UniProtKB/Swiss-Prot annotation:
This is Shikimate dehydrogenase (NADP(+)). Keywords: Amino-acid biosynthesis, Aromatic amino acid biosynthesis, NADP, Oxidoreductase. The keyword Chloroplast does not apply. Shikimate binds at S18, R19, S20, T65, N90, D106, Y225. It comes from Verminephrobacter eiseniae (strain EF01-2). Homodimer. Belongs to the shikimate dehydrogenase family.
Amino acid sequence: MRQTADLYCVLGNPIAHSRSPAIHARFAELTGERIRYERRLLPIDGFARGLRDFAAQGGRGCSVTVPFKTEALRCATACSERAQLAGAANTLSLHADGSISADNTDGLGLVADITRNAGIALAGCDVLLVGAGGAAAGVLGPLLHAGVRHITVANRTLAKAQALVQSHSALAALRKTQLKACGLQAPLADFDIIINASASSLAGADVPVPASVLRPASLAYDMMYGPAAQGFLDWARRHGARPRDGLGMLVEQAAEAFWLWRGLRPPSAQVLAELQEAAAKPASGADR
């Protein structure tokens, strides 16, 4: 039995809002693992140095949140296909020989939350992915692997949506999924699942797509959680859709990171249920 707890952290700026320490502490408690998991606020230009300092202190792994996910991938000596395709990493594993492995568990977390926690099969679904930034890039690959029938990436800047689609075109062809890009002003069909990966929730802006994209009982999923997602969820509810925020995605992506680090699958559904039970309390809501 280990006498000292292994050290992990979440790196970001801002970082005070992060629920990751509480989630990983609960995972450790339920699995009997001895870990210490901290928040670490880094200067905007200080990610590489902060990562080196953490490694020098014996750190075993770290979660990475905004704005450092792209830089985290560059700092790694090896990366998963998921991270490479996304162009960003949210999970780093630090090894005894000084090497660093990068992965991106965001999309796995999203797929797990939709399929296991919400009970919705993704195979054969038509999906609208709103946004073409880092959040969208992190989930597009796993959505393709999940066997969806069609994905439309809609973004205010059409060129960004087109670039994201182009970077995933080979995988889409392999998975026999129709994948296309459009601007937010383009006519849109209706969809089984609408995923908001845009910054509209954080900005408090109106939902960037019309209600006509919704089918009866469509899943309307905001990757944010708590107050940040409320406007989108209210919009979905008003139009007869099934609203869901990204709290389950947060827990499930953390569970994937825990498995990468510890080789154990934590009881993520139990931890999510505990967080949902406390959902009536005020919650900040954005990222890892």
